[in-house]
């Protein structure tokens, strides 16, 4: 009986969590799950990362992906989720340029190489509840690759930070993925500031250790560097 209860609880927990296995570029999804997006360690369990200082906060990967997606500068991108994104919290996107002599198919994204290209802020719904864009949908919010991003190979990283339990230490849950992309038709911008993952976040950052049930929408402070919009 206890085993059955445990299995049922595990199944419920899995349905409450999610992964982002498929990148969509200008409305066109990658051919199949984990084709250009690196398979994450939680591909089966769907559990998020809870220690923002651990190496898993970078890409949470168990392996690299076999392919690289072509993404024009200025393109709109988002991810398909395996389950409904039902937890409240921001969605943020980062890019990291692959160094010369390395490949998007093998590079690990280490060092101060990541820059943020977008984040989302909460708002009050008709019931005066704090919600985030694309909450309770099956896709992450759209973002645009800045037109001034230099051409080349990159890792594209998405994270959705679930904050429903974030009033306690390490209660925030990070659901994330990294995709291997080739940006074409880029510009001459200088993206920044550049940060390392791990390194950009602390467990007690105000956007990570936070009680979202006692705040107004404008009070929230997303973790990490400011957005580079090109």
UniProtKB/Swiss-Prot annotation:
Residues 1-16 form the signal peptide. GO terms for biological process: cellulose catabolic process. Disulfide bonds join 59-178. Gene3D superfamilies: 2.70.50.70. Its cofactor is Cu(2+). It is an enzyme of class 1 (oxidoreductase). Glycans are attached at residue 142. Keywords: Carbohydrate metabolism, Cellulose degradation, Copper, Disulfide bond, Glycoprotein, Metal-binding, Monooxygenase, Oxidoreductase, Polysaccharide degradation, Secreted, Signal. It catalyses: [(1->4)-beta-D-glucosyl]n+m + reduced acceptor + O2 = 4-dehydro-beta-D-glucosyl-[(1->4)-beta-D-glucosyl]n-1 + [(1->4)-beta-D-glucosyl]m + acceptor + H2O. InterPro entries: AA9 (IPR049892), AA9_LPMO (IPR005103). Pfam families: AA9. Lignocellulose is the most abundant polymeric composite on Earth and is a recalcitrant but promising renewable substrate for industrial biotechnology applications. Together with cellobiose dehydrogenases (CDHs) an enzymatic system capable of oxidative cellulose cleavage is formed, which increases the efficiency of cellulases and put LPMOs at focus of biofuel research. This is AA9 family lytic polysaccharide monooxygenase T. It comes from Thermothielavioides terrestris (strain ATCC 38088 / NRRL 8126). The gene is LPMO9T.
């Amino acid at each position: 009986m206890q085993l059955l209860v445990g299995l049922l609880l595990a199944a419920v927990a899995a349905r409450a969590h999610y992964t982002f296995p498929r990148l969509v570029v200008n409305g066109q999804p990658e051919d199949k799950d984990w084709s250009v997006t690196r398979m994450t360690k939680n591909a089966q369990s769907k559990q998020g990362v809870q220690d923002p200082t651990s190496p898993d906060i970078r890409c949470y990967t168990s392996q690299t992906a076999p392919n690289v997606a072509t993404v024009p500068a200025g393109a709109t991108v988002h991810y398909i989720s395996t389950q409904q994104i039902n937890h409240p919290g921001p969605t943020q996107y980062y890019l990291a340029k692959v160094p010369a002599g390395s490949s998007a198919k093998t590079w690990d994204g280490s060092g101060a190489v990541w820059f943020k290209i977008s984040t989302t802020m909460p708002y009050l719904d008709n019931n005066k509840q704090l919600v985030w864009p694309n909450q309770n949908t099956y896709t992450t919010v759209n973002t645009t690759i800045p037109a001034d991003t230099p051409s080349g190979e990159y890792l594209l990283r998405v994270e959705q930070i679930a904050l429903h339990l974030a009033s306690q230490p390490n209660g925030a849950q990070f659901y994330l993925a990294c995709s291997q992309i080739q940006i074409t038709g880029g510009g001459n911008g200088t993206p920044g500031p550049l940060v390392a993952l791990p390194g950009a976040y602390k467990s007690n950052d105000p956007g990570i250790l936070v009680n979202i049930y006692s705040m107004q929408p404008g009070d929230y402070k997303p973790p990490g560097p400011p957005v580079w919009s090109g």
